[in-house]
């Protein structure tokens, strides 16, 4: 076999590998885009696409609360304006975060890779005037994968007191 044959073979294999990598990348990008679209289509709940560290990747929270400033770190408790998260600087760092029922359920759901629903809790939230209020919430979560990366689509609904 001559040298030209090997050069063409290597070039062909390289092109095929590049095409496969691009296809995988586009598939993951499309999966993520579909999840983001689902987040913004929901209007009766606050929707959060979060990773294992509770970092918010997408949300409709600020679209539904135009009077609330988008000035918090993109971590679940901070975006929701949880009093403990804001007072401590970051969701998950306060002493009360260890007993937060929402945090415990989501952590467990990530470990078990299972959906959860109808979790009710009372949250201490700040309103737009930075006044602390007690708010009953119902939380549901749906496991979603982008490629092999697990995320949760978390739905939070306020329950009137």
Language-model regions, residue ranges each:
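PAS/PAC sensory module
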Residues: 120, 134-140
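Alpha-helical transmembrane segments and their helix-membrane boundary motifs
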Residues: 1-28, 98
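N-terminal sensory regulatory modules of PAS/LOV and PAS-like folds
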Residues: 71-81
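Short, solvent-exposed loop/turn segments that connect beta-strands within catalytic domains
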Residues: 128-133, 146-149
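Sensory modules in modular signal-transduction proteins
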Residues: 29-66
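Short loop/turn elements at sensory-signaling interfaces that couple input to output
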Residues: 138-153
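Sensory-domain boundary capping and coupling elements
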Residues: 156-157
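Terminal output helix/cap of sensory domains in signal transduction proteins
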Residues: 79-125
């Amino acid at each position: 076999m001559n040298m030209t044959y090997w050069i063409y073979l290597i070039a062909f294999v390289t092109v095929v590998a590049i095409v496969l990598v691009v296809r995988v990348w586009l598939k993951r990008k499309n999966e993520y885009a579909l999840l983001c679209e689902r987040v913004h289509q929901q209007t009766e709940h606050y929707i959060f696409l979060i990773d294992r560290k509770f970092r918010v990747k997408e949300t409709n929270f600020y679209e539904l609360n135009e009077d609330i400033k988008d000035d918090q770190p993109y971590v679940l408790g901070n975006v929701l304006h949880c009093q403990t998260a804001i007072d401590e600087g970051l969701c998950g760092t306060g002493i009360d975060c260890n007993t937060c029922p929402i945090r415990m359920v989501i952590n467990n759901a990530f470990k078990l890779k299972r959906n959860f629903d109808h979790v009710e809790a009372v949250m201490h939230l700040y309103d737009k005037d930075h006044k602390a209020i007690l708010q009953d919430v119902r939380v549901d979560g749906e496991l979603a994968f982008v490629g092999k990366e697990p995320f949760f689509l978390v739905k939070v609904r306020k329950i009137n007191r």
